[in-house]
Amino acid sequence: MSSRSVLTTCAMVVTCGAVIPQFWSVDLARCDARLRNDTTGAPAYPPAMLLKVVRFAYSQGIVRSRAIERVCREHVTFMALCGMSAPHFTTIAHFVSTLRDDIAQVFAAVLAVCDGQGLIGREMFAIDGVKLPSNASKHRSGTRAEFTQRAEKLEAAATTMLDRHRATDALDLEPDVAAKTTARIARLTRDAQQLRDWLAIHPHDRRGPTGGLRKSNRTDNASAKMATDKGVIQGYTGVAAVDAAHQIIVNAQAHGTGSEQELLLPVVDALAALRTSETLLTADAGYHSAANLAALAEREVTALIADPDMRQRDERLADRAHHTTAPDPLHDKSRPAPPASSVFTPEDFTYDADARTCVCPAGKSLYRKGAANVTNGYVGEHFRGAKRDCVPCALRAACLRTPETTLVRNVAFLRGRVPTEAAPSPPKDTHTTRMQQRLDTPAGRAQYGRRFATVEPVFANIRFNKRLDRFTLRGRTKVVGQWLLFCLVHNIEKLAHAGYAA
């Protein structure tokens, strides 16, 4: 089967048990040139066929290349799409991993068709991201210092085992024991050498936009270690800008970082050709920063970016604490509260504010150190025990946290905060305050309230309905291509459900 420069793309989506085809022309000249047949060898598979197979497989939640190969041999729909050619899984994997530039053109072509059908309203674009794991191990993350320490530990362990093995050479050991010891020494040496080789290839640590240190990863150094509500993952953040009219994804990017603040401006710049002067951009508090708001104002972009205190200022949510459910203990990642002190507290001492005296639980009077001592911004009276009373006291263990090192007890009775001068009020005319003022208006709340219903169902469709919940490739270039494929499946489904006008 020869390759064609123009593909009549078949959009297959399952709706009510039926497969609905939609057709339009997409130029695949670049993809054809890259997969052109050689003068020798077997004919190349047409990229049009491979793209149809991969896209339909993704729409069914089939992402692994071996699984796609299997259904091409066993499933009648895939057999029809591939023309009974049943491409090998290595061919499918190579096609997907080298598809970024080509799939970007297909994504743009499908977006143009959606625009021609009136599915892009340009009234509001909601920007958000989803953190997905990738084909990388989070256990192989660390800084150069941590990798160096691991290599030294492995080398030390290998040396210790080798010395022990040499010391027992004269003994009559079981052959299996000697073979296992030799294999373990070789494995430790190999792992240490792999770390040394990686350190030689990567002489510098990863740095963030502000110069902060970021952990590298030896399986995929472009990925990032990110915290989610389900735990820590090693992967990428898939960012999408979704139009509010029909939930069409108008821009899709993938980045190896969990910091959303640095992902806003790349999406805004990519939307410059698509949005109008009246298009509203919305994003949640993860994208809020003074630098981002200043950049949006400089670009004259109309946007509503939530700040972390937006809900606290909303009077409609004044009684939100009453409706808060108990936290799930399995997902509570906060640090446990420190245990209650087992020593005597100031309430256990007898304090006379008028006489300015203090008596400890053992009945001994304490010396007053001052009437206006300041501790952490609080003013009060401080008392100190006498050494002749505290050292031989029988209640010493119940009075001092470290009786073996502390000689006497100190206690303070605070009266209130130290009066300070009023802090200067922040400037009123800043990008942050202006954004807050817009968000706090009824119109701003109504506009921003549409963000959640616009972008979150898109991620739900991709992750749960389509089961496209992880990246199977390594390297940002390949992951961007796969994320575009994920978003392309969503857009084609939206287009098919909306109907195709003549």
Language model region names:
Residues 1-7, 311, 320:
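Short, flexible loop/hinge motifs at secondary-structure junctions
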Residues 8-55:
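Basic, short loop/linker segments at the boundary and entry of helix-turn-helix/winged-helix-like folds
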Residues 6, 24-27, 143, 345:
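Short, solvent-exposed coil/turn linker segments
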